[in-house]
Amino acid sequence: MSALTPHVGVRTLHDGTDAEPLLIADMSTIGGVFVAADADAAKFPLNVPVSFTTDDAAMVAAAGVAAGNTLAQTIEAISSEGVIARMVAVRVAAGSDATATLANVVGSSGAKTGAWALLEAGSETGDDPDILIAPGFTHNRVSNAANPVATAFDAICERLPTAIAVCDGPGTTNAAASEWAADFADTVNICLIDPPVR
């Protein structure tokens, strides 16, 4: 009887026979920025996003094993959980000191280096990262200001619609964690983990 009632406007009837496309979004690709001095430079060039899975033996071997290699440590941590993950890794050079290394991890938005290279992952590898990490570089506030890596991740997440950054907190006191979290109180792109993941 609804067809007999007065109607003004457009009426659309769906007969249910059309096939609807099933869209599946992969929301589990880990995008990370790592220092791995002993990694194979041919397979992990500096400031270039590289996509691989953690069960790819050749890529895992190419990641290196030296102390301080955050890429190898991350792969090991993922594998120890008994899961296989797709990763987009950006390798950066260690600087002459901690401040220089942190600057390399942050990188340049214009030159797309460091964390900003993750924005090129979709076009270069076909995999857009969804979970952004930089193990060992997000836990501290620098000069009593917001962590620069987390700040870069916040801006990157605005341009990668499904991305979220998982950042280690200071791991010291509740007050320090609260202060860190307050720097990002106005964003939903940053997930603070405190105490940090080990």
What are the residue ranges of the model-derived segments?
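Surface-exposed assembly/interface segments
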Residues: 1-198
